[in-house]
Amino acid sequence: MSYKMSRAAYANMFGPTVGDKVRLADTELFIEVERDFTTHGEEVKFGGGKVIRDGMGQSQVTREGGAVDTVITNALIVDHWGIVKADIGLKDGRISAIGKAGNPDTQAGVTIIVGPGTEVIAGEGKIVTAGGMDSHIHFICPQQIDEALMSGITCMLGGGTGPAHGTLATTCTPGPWHIARMIEAADAFPMNLAFAGKGNASLPGALVEMVLGGATSLKLHEDWGTTPAAIDCCLSVADEYDVQVMIHTDTLNESGFVEDTIAAIKGRTIHAYHTEGAGGGHAPDIIRICGQPNVIPSSTNPTRPYTVNTLAEHLDMLMVCHHLSPSIPEDIAFAESRIRKETIAAEDILHDIGAFSIISSDSQAMGRVGEVAIRTWQTADKMKRQRGRLKEESGGNDNFRVKRYIAKYTINPAIAHGLSHEIGSLETGKRADLVLWNPTFFGVKPDMVLLGGTIAAAPMGDPNASIPTPQPVHYRPMFGAYGKSRTNSSVTFVSQASLDAGLAGRLGVAKALVAVQNTRGGIGKASMVHNSLTPHIEVDPETYEVRANGELLTCEPASVLPMAQRYFLF
């Protein structure tokens, strides 16, 4: 017997379905459900008097017989590949299926079997995304990891050894000894971690040593001397050992100009950090490299998006991060050369048209580790308000823009760094590193963060209360952050060469060491999902005006942003 429900009543009970629209936080971004994998009238839902009960939505199937470990019911998936309603089955710490959950003995079309051994996470009215990846981390303090996790980041890649001055300025873990200590420390944290070695050397020996020591990538930084010789040497080692290279170019143009850097790269794949230039790089025209087919350009979040306060805060940040002195005129000139409103404004637009591919943090080194998602969606909102709908959109929604922007901190950094076989998207077979969001708090404050299918973090009320919700409610580590569950639910990424050289046996760490792969000639700008545009970029050396394919790129700074003070009263 059929039963008719209004759309509002259905959405309140089972979450939105095809044709329904959802607003993301307090932005002007609206998504529309494209497909519903569940079956109307056969939805599964947990609770008193609900469907997932013995003999109803719960079968007798054992785990060995095919029942999943966890089912997330009626979730709204937001990923680069689609915006869909589905049940999500998790097994062995991975996504086992996306489809229709239930009891195959009583329901048709079941692709996710719910059994007595299945836990339920209620996804009705929630958005589920892949865990974010922050690919520009200065490992200055371990407390960053908690901050990132609670914001929805489940993988952090970068370099450092703590608050050493090299780490305060550069994302490098120099030498195999320091890399080993950081890999050992990784066991203590509920986070997928990956470490970058220092790439600044004119001879390959020391770089090879770091790759064999476990570095997943090599970082070229101007503070260590990013000369053409160092660039060429570093990329040659990377090509031999299949690791990525990240570059922060020469702001002062001492060893060459942007043309010389492009020539030294020789068409090889490279990830260009803070390609706009405020974070560092050839002044004033490093932004030109975002038009190169072999360059994967990224932003760090202090310039995301361009606001009335952006320029004012950057000078002091830069002086601290790069060990500069306000009493030395040359240091002040160095800092001021990097901060240009024209290129920062252009950066907004280049993100919106898909010419910049990645957004990351630059944690504690001119960036905020807990604001990768927030700054990404603030940029998307600002661009919609200023530029209107994208030409790629169809229907009365912002689905394409949302897919473009979520790719910037999920799948694209994963592809760039050889991790997309494990993380970066919500797809069958990948790690179950997932984030649940209430749409009202989307991008700002997660409802729950899973690592390897285990709940690692969530907001939680007073532990002595009779129910979980009484104040004070704040983020707390969950069971996935403790004991062996911590080391089993997350991994440390390393180079394949280091595993072949016996790194796991030498270090004896508890976490699994997983190799990066396909970081070199197999990828490039064209591999960046929804963010692969390569326009011809020109920068006026006098006015700093930026043009893409002849069109002036400029926009006004925002004076008000969504996802800001409204969400952070306390």
UniProtKB/Swiss-Prot annotation:
Cofactor annotation remark: Binds 2 nickel ions per subunit.
Active site: H322
Cofactor(s) it depends on: Ni cation
Modified residues (N6-carboxylysine): K219
GO cellular component: cytoplasm
Keyword Cytoplasm part of the UniProt annotation: yes
Residue ranges occupied by any Urease domain in the UniProt entry: 131-570
Keyword Cell membrane: no
Record's subunit section: Heterotrimer of UreA (gamma), UreB (beta) and UreC (alpha) subunits. Three heterotrimers associate to form the active enzyme.
Protein name: Urease subunit alpha
Organism: Sinorhizobium medicae (strain WSM419)
